[in-house]
């Protein structure tokens, strides 16, 4: 196999695609590089579909190797383990834009693996992995209606920046990833600092325009190195069976979709499916699959047709109405902050917990170790949809929804100096019928304010949908689960009254114009403002006081040279401090001391003791001390915690002293004056002329 390499200028950097040198037994393998960041992406597909397969089994795995950054993994086994959150999120980021581009009816297993093999400090490998997945599929011969391009867009000083460096992102008001084909945007993932809808939309269009040269480069690579496309044809439909099922099932399904309550509707749909399976199914698994597929098409036609004809939606609403909302704050007695947010048949119980710096999450990434003071975890138990299932580690969807909600809230959090707490928010989805991630955003904002966190502004979120047939289309506000599955777009927008803080978009079809996206954003703004109005009626700002069960944090600054005095030999001093006061104490290398305690008096006591431990001894100042040890030549007196001075025998009294024991005893309280502190820090004391 001949090695073929293509290059393109992409945001001022050279993007290189190479195939034919590595992983040659994969159907498609492309090495993507920019700077010193290199990602190997492979695509492999099974030629035969598994019997009875009724869904498309696409698997995407993004993995970062420690050696890529010149590191050895930690832990006992010293090798990479379960996927990190970054790896899981990037796997989803790749999956979302490529999945809609496989032909309908294609049920063969496909696996895409992106492996980061080298990484620098300027180029994030996620965009390279996305581009590489597109290129690997394009050269593989697997049926795929690509390629796609992808780009990251920042907004700095009023200008859009293509593929910013890590350093540039720290000053950017926007971090947006957009992916799509030559004609259409397919996926957007972003977080923003309360930017307007117009700025967000222009960022999407800017990114789409800028990655066109990447698509052209992938097409050129595929023309030279691509394998012949598989001779795959879509399963042939049984027209006679289709007519029979349609005649029988259509009126029954129309009756089912006239039911506005989810559980009743689901039960009726299940009954229809069972009846059709009995009447038209057989022992032939293929025929049963065909019947299920036909029913799905009929359902899709009913729901979409009603909406485009202007009829009420599944639950009786028009296209712009938000479902009924009920809001409760402070619903749990012992938590630091809590809220119960219910929107229609979607409900989230959200709890906020305040912690100390020691509770921050330590993230060991390829780019280096960092700490995260804000964590948001989203849980989606099976009972939320009336089902049974496994309960355990979070799935990819839960991690993705949690990150979206976190992005939405992060823009309004106070700085560490304004509110020196670590924050953990947990969303328990108790009921779900669409838009549970946006219910989490609303609940998280309320729970944090209930906990006393001074947010810059409340945040709300709403999920939008789209039904489009030819020139006719309808944008839907606050979509249901069925509208998500049967629609053409899932468009989630979160933000404040001032602007957008997070936007996530997944589009399943071509032809979504700028005008349609603009309408969706404006309709989402109206929905968001409506929800914020209801939220503000319950809680519009952080409560003035923290929960009685939340830690009180005191922050003081000490001389870094005195840190050792607070810690003591082997941690003896700080251990005694925490045990005796009950406070948690954290000391940074720069001398910042954080004292946390649920009991305010305990925190104040710990503060006083640390101030004494780190206080500088002042010459000519009188101290209340305690005799620590008596010697023949005098006594050592403790004047501050950990600070002893020498009281020489000649300084005990104005009269001559022959035996120190005649005047002092160990443990005796005495008042002494500091005469001198020499260069070595040794302290000389005197009791002369000091009233005892």
Swiss-Prot record:
Q: List its EC numbers.
A: 2.7.7.8
* Residues in KH domain copies: 551-610
What is the reaction catalyzed? RNA(n+1) + phosphate = RNA(n) + a ribonucleoside 5'-diphosphate
Domain of life from the UniProt record: Bacteria
Annotated residues that bind Mg(2+) are located at 484, 490
- Is RNA-binding tagged as a keyword? yes
Q: Which GO terms describe its molecular function?
A: 3'-5'-RNA exonuclease activity; magnesium ion binding; polyribonucleotide nucleotidyltransferase activity; RNA binding
Cofactors demanded by this protein: Mg(2+)
* Cell compartments where the protein resides: Cytoplasm
Limits of the S1 motif domain: 620-688
Q: What class of enzyme is it?
A: transferase
Q: Name one GO cellular component term.
A: cytosol
Pfam families for this protein:
KH_1, PNPase, RNase_PH, RNase_PH_C, S1
Among Gene3D superfamilies, the record links this protein to: GHMP Kinase, N-terminal domain, K Homology domain, type 1, Nucleic acid-binding proteins
Q: Which UniProt keywords apply?
A: Cytoplasm, Magnesium, Metal-binding, Nucleotidyltransferase, RNA-binding, Transferase
* InterPro entries hit by this protein: ExoRNase_PH_dom1, ExoRNase_PH_dom2, ExoRNase_PH_dom2_sf, KH_dom, KH_dom_type_1, KH_dom_type_1_sf, NA-bd_OB-fold, PNPase
> What's an example GO BP annotation here?
mRNA catabolic process
Primary site of residence: cytoplasm
Q: What assembly does the database describe for this protein?
A: Component of the RNA degradosome, which is a multiprotein complex involved in RNA processing and mRNA degradation.
| Entry-linked HAMAP family | PNPase
Task performed by this protein: Involved in mRNA degradation. Catalyzes the phosphorolysis of single-stranded polyribonucleotides processively in the 3'- to 5'-direction.
Family, according to the entry, reads as follows: Belongs to the polyribonucleotide nucleotidyltransferase family.
Q: What is this protein called?
A: Polyribonucleotide nucleotidyltransferase
Quote the gene name from the UniProt entry: pnp
């Amino acid at each position: 196999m001949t090695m073929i390499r293509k290059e393109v200028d992409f945001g001022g950097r050279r993007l290189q695609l190479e195939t034919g040198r590595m992983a040659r037994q994969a159907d498609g393998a492309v090495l993507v590089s920019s700077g010193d960041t290199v990602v190997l992406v492979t695509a492999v597909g099974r030629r035969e579909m598994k019997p009875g397969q009724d869904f498309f089994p696409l698997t995407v795995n993004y993995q970062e190797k420690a050696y890529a950054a010149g590191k050895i993994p930690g832990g006992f086994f010293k090798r990479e383990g379960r996927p990190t959150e970054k790896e899981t999120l990037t796997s989803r980021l790749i999956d979302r834009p490529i999945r809609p581009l496989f032909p309908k009816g294609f049920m063969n297993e496909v696996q895409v693996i992106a492996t980061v093999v080298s990484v620098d400090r300027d180029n994030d490998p996620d965009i390279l992995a996305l581009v590489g997945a597109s290129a690997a599929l394009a050269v593989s011969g697997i049926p795929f209606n690509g390629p796609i391009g992808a780009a990251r867009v920042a907004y700095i000083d009023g200008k859009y920046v293509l593929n910013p460096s890590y350093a540039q992102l720290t000053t950017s008001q926007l971090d947006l990833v957009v992916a799509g084909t030559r004609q259409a945007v397919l996926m957007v993932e972003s977080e923003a600092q309360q930017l307007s809808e117009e700025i967000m939309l222009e960022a999407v269009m800017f990114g789409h325009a800028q990655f066109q040269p990447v698509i052209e480069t992938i097409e050129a690579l595929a023309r030279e190195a691509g394998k012949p496309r598989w001779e795959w044809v879509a399963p042939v439909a049984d027209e006679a069976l289709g007519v029979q099922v349609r005649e029988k099932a259509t009126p029954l399904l129309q009756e089912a979709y006239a039911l506005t309550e989810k559980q009743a509707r689901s039960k009726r749909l299940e009954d229809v499916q069972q009846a059709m399976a009995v009447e038209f199914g057989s022992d032939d698994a293929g025929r049963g699959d065909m019947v299920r597929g036909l029913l799905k098409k009929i359902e899709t036609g009913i729901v979409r047709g009603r909406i485009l004809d202007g009829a009420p939606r599944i639950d009786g609403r028009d296209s712009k109405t938000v479902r009924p909302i009920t809001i409760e704050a402070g619903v749990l007695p012992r938590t630091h902050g809590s809220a119960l947010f219910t929107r229609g048949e979607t409900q989230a119980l959200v709890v906020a917990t305040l912690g100390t710096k020691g509770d921050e999450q330590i993230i060991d990434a390829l780019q280096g170790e960092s700490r995260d003071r804000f964590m948001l975890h989203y849980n989606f138990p099976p009972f939320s949809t009336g089902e049974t299932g496994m309960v355990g580690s979070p799935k990819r969807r839960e991690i993705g929804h949690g990150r979206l909600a976190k992005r939405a809230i992060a823009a309004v959090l106070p700085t560490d100096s304004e509110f020196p707490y670590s924050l953990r928010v947990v969303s328990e989805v108790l009921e779900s019928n669409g838009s549970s991630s946006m219910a989490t955003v609303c609940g998280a904002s309320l729970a944090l304010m209930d906990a006393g966190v001074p947010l810059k502004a409340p945040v709300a979120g709403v999920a939008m949908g789209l039904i489009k047939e030819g020139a006719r289309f309808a944008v839907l506000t606050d979509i249901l689960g069925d509208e998500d599955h049967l629609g053409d777009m899932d468009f989630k927008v979160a933000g404040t009254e001032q602007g957008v803080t997070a936007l996530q978009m997944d589009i399943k079809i071509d032809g979504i114009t700028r005008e349609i996206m603009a309408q969706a954003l404006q309709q989402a703004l109206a929905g968001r403002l409506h929800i914020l109005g209801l939220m503000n009626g319950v809680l519009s700002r952080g409560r003035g006081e923290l929960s009685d069960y939340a830690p009180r944090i005191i922050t003081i600054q000490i001389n870094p040279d005195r840190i050792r005095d607070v810690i003591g030999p082997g941690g003896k001093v700080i251990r005694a401090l925490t045990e005796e006061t009950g406070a948690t104490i954290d000391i940074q290398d720069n001398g910042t001391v954080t004292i946390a305690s649920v009991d305010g008096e305990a925190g104040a006591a710990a503060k006083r003791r640390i101030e004494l431990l780190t206080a500088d001894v002042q010459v000519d100042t009188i101290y209340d001390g305690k005799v620590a040890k008596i010697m023949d030549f005098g006594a050592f007196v403790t004047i501050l915690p950990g600070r002893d001075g020498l009281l020489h025998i000649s300084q005990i009294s104005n009269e001559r002293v022959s035996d120190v024991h005649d005047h002092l005893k160990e443990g005796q309280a005495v008042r002494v004056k500091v005469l001198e502190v020499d260069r070595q820090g040794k302290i000389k004391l005197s009791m002369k002329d000091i009233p005892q």
